[in-house]
Regions:
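Short acidic/histidine-rich active-site segments
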Residues: 124-131
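Short gly/pro/ser/thr-enriched loop/turn and capping motifs at secondary-structure boundaries
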Residues: 102-105, 131-133
Length: 162
């Protein structure tokens, strides 16, 4: 395998089992020198009261991934550069953002990605924002330009016809 991903829903009734499973997977993966993507989301009816603060909850999710041995973490965007800096600064591993709401426009999605990179984010891990896009190849190219080539949103949209 080139890598492994494991999801934990903080606040879910199954959270303890998910955390235990993530720990076991990371232990085995480290032995095999295989990177682990922890997809950690603060959501669920049992979410700790402290975690009702979205930024603290996402920072806690990132820290949980790091402490359990993940190589990289995927979590949700907190809504601003300032708040996401609090997340990226609490761990020494790359913090990737998920794709966000299905209703987001191309420009909104690219703006979120650009802001996350400005806040120290490590990139993106997206599904529907790419696969459901009318031009998935152009969307991937625009995302790459923003994440890896320091393009701004307008430049990426113009260069790839979005």
């Amino acid at each position: 395998a080139k890598g492994v991903s494991v999801q934990v829903n903080m606040g879910s009734p199954d959270e303890p089992d998910m955390i235990e499973r993530l720990g076991m997977v990371t232990q085995d993966s480290h032995y095999l020198n295989c990177p682990v993507l922890g997809m950690i989301y603060p959501r669920g009816e049992n979410l700790n009261v402290m975690e009702n603060d979205d930024t603290k909850a996402v920072a806690h999710a990132a820290r949980l991934a790091f402490e359990l041995g993940c190589t990289v973490v995927k979590t949700k965007w907190t809504g601003s550069i300032e708040s996401f800096k609090k997340v990226t600064s609490c761990v020494p591993i790359p913090v990737l953002i998920a794709g966000g709401p299905a209703s987001s426009s191309t420009k909104e999605t690219l703006e979120i990605v650009h802001q996350s990179i400005q806040a120290g984010g490590g990139g993106v891990c997206m599904g529907r924002q790419v696969f459901s896009h009318e031009n998935p190849n152009a969307m991937v190219s625009a995302l790459k330009a923003i994440v890896h080539d320091n393009a701004n949103v307008e430049q990426a949209m113009r260069d790839f016809g979005l």
